[in-house]
Amino acid sequence: LFDRLFEAQPTELAELEEFAGALLNGKNELDSGLFCQIYQALLSRARHTKDRNAIIRYLYWLGIGRHNMCAKMVGIDLADIEYYMSQMRLCFAEAAAYLKYFDEIDDVETKGYILRSRANTALGQFKSASAKIRVIKQTLQILQDKEYQKNAPELPWDRYLYMTHQQMASSISYNRDNDMTAQDVVTIMESAHIVHQQRITESLNKQEAPPIRTAFSCYAVEYYCGLLTLEELLGRIEKLMNQVDTSSFSLENMYAAISLPAFYCQYLREYPEQLSKREKYLENLYPKVLSYAEAFPKNEANEQIFFYLRQLSTTFIETPHSISYGDFQQNIMIHFAPDVYVHSQVVGKTTAILCDIILLEEPNFFDDIEQIRAITNFDAKRQAVYDFAMNCGVLHDVGKINFINLFSRTARQWFDEEYEITRLHTIVGHKRLDTCASTHNYAAAALGHHSWYDGSHGYPETYKRLACPYRQIVDVVGLIDWIDNTLNRPWLYGHPKKNFEEIIQEALSLEGKRFSPLLTARLRDSSVLEHIRQTFLSA
């Protein structure tokens, strides 16, 4: 259909939109990349035919698709993802700009898309909470304008207002260095209480449990207003988390079971003096989170639970007796991304074997790593290198948790934009490993395993090989990661299927460019090569 899109009949276009709707329908995400491709093509056609109603509708849905991609970027600094946020916001801003033609547009559905696009310009990350709040306030003013309401009385204005108040209630900043004005806090408090009271009414009418999410929003803003102490706020969050129905995977329960712990940890990160009093609670909380997540039905695709897991992966705090961050991440991968988990285990084991071979030949090879250099007993040093290499390999791809749907559910080659987005897994993986004591030393492997030895290609630019004391092990992880991906996932990267021998020959052709000559020299040793081959097979 794409080949003759400009000649397509209205019924065919409607069928294409229906197909796209099944790819991304809110709760389920089958293929958001293809969803965006379809709406980008439909938008081009609508621009060509100058169909204003279609342009507005397609801009809205393309923005929704791009927002879905942006939602995967939780935990990544705005500077690294501003381009993607701008691409999303431009779609909504262009559609919202048609507000000036609101009076002359006859189609009520199109008017609805204009208003929804206006509200959605506040989606995603902003440089400050105040900037986001300002955009939402402007939307509220538009939605409360009687002239607009009179012009389109058929639209669900109350619903639009409620959703925008909900957006405002979730805009509070949780940073210790508060970037909100006093008026910002007042505005958020008004919206939070409006939403909470409506949710209480709805839950009573439906005979449901009291709302948890909106209660937290109220508590958070009351804390910022000085109505609650931090201790009282944390205590109330604990009570909300204790209300989780572990047998239910409703949005409310998923929020309470996984997202609330993320906010709880964020407060403890911002106020570490509170941590000692709550270590025991935190240590008991993580197993509950994992138990709940692992019970999630495997045949269901719910992007919301992945979003909440990304939140908790970003704010996770280790304590002396809690599950380690590395183990927490591996538990998530086993359940939700088993292919990524297996790949990481293979890379870890093979990296450790190759590093052991190198160490036996050159005992000082890894001495740029301070803790390795400090070990004088060779047997102890050998074990330390093996363990270090294993952990670097096992954890090098933790950033892929942000892009679970792309790495584990897409049985097709990626689109160019998806290739670009998945490169962010190195940045987010590095950031997360770097913040926890048990994984800090392995962060370089997450950042640098896609860089090239000579620096001519690869990513990210923030990895500076010569300045990294872990570069020798990062080089090994990068080589083994490439071999395994080329061997077992060529379709994902658009490569033809190759056998092990062909892949090794290709690696040798990249000697001194992509791969360190110190490593490729080992690939010319038949005994070493056979050892690596057998490790791949057994792993």
Task: Identify the meaning behind each predicted range.
Residues 343, 396, 425, 449-450:
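Histidine-centered active-site/metal-ligand motif
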Residues 413-414, 491-501:
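Short, charged, surface-exposed loops that flank catalytic or proteolytic processing sites
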Residues 1-346, 350-354:
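Non-catalytic interface/linker regions that flank or bridge core catalytic/transmembrane domains
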Residues 106-109, 154, 370-393, 433-478, ...:
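Histidine/acidic-rich helix-loop-helix segments that form or flank divalent-metal centers
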Residues 353-357, 401, 432-436, 483-489:
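Signal-transmission/dimerization alpha-helices at domain junctions
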Residues 294-420, 463:
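Acidic/His-rich, divalent-metal-binding segments that scaffold phosphate/diphosphate chemistry
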Residues 345-356, 418-434, 499-515:
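An active-site-proximal "capping" alpha-helix that borders the catalytic cofactor pocket
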Residues 399-405, 454-458, 486:
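Short acidic/His/Gly/Ser-rich catalytic and metal-binding motifs that mark active-site loops
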